């Protein structure tokens, strides 16, 4: 439980198993290579508050992080926004990432290969009225399976090569 440690965020939950193997941390050049990492059987809740202490940090974040293999199994994360304005939840059966590169100085983030299996995602704006059909304020996606290559987020734009995508939404929409 991080209550009181981060000015506008509380993170609590439990970690079943966490493993990180790294053979390359270069403090002088601000680079990290994570060879293998995994998170299993974990539950995390993130609560964002509407008031935060002013950030007085003067140094820039220059880190470049390379991730060879990252795996998440049987884990979930729930995020609640200030004033209960939005709720986001993800229950991951398995998520695997291969060859990720994250340049924090340039705000450039890439993943060569991502696979998601047997997962669920929920997006909810609790104060909005429910609508018939596909309701963008109350989404619940189940049976989510996806394979994506060449994911890139840079300059507020995202691109990806979607190899496969399967999902069901509670309104009856199915993508196969």
Mark where each language-model region is.
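N-terminal targeting/secretion presequences
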Residues: 1-176
């Amino acid at each position: 439980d991080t209550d009181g440690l981060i000015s506008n965020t509380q993170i609590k939950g439990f970690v079943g198993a966490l493993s990180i193997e790294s053979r390359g941390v270069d403090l002088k050049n601000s680079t990290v290579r994570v060879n293998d990492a995994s998170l299993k059987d974990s539950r995390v809740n993130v609560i964002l508050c509407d008031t935060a202490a002013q950030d007085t940090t003067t140094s820039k974040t220059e880190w470049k992080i390379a991730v060879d293999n990252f795996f998440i199994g049987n884990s979930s994360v729930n995020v609640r926004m200030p004033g209960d304005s939005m709720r986001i939840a993800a229950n991951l059966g398995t998520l695997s990432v291969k060859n990720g590169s994250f340049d924090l100085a340039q705000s450039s983030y890439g993943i060569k290969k991502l696979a998601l299996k047997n997962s669920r995602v929920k997006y909810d704006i609790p104060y909005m009225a429910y609508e018939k059909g596909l309701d963008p304020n109350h989404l619940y996606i189940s049976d989510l399976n996806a394979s994506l290559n060449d994911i890139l987020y840079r300059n507020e734009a995202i691109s990806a090569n979607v190899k496969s995508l399967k999902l069901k939404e509670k309104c009856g929409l199915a993508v196969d």
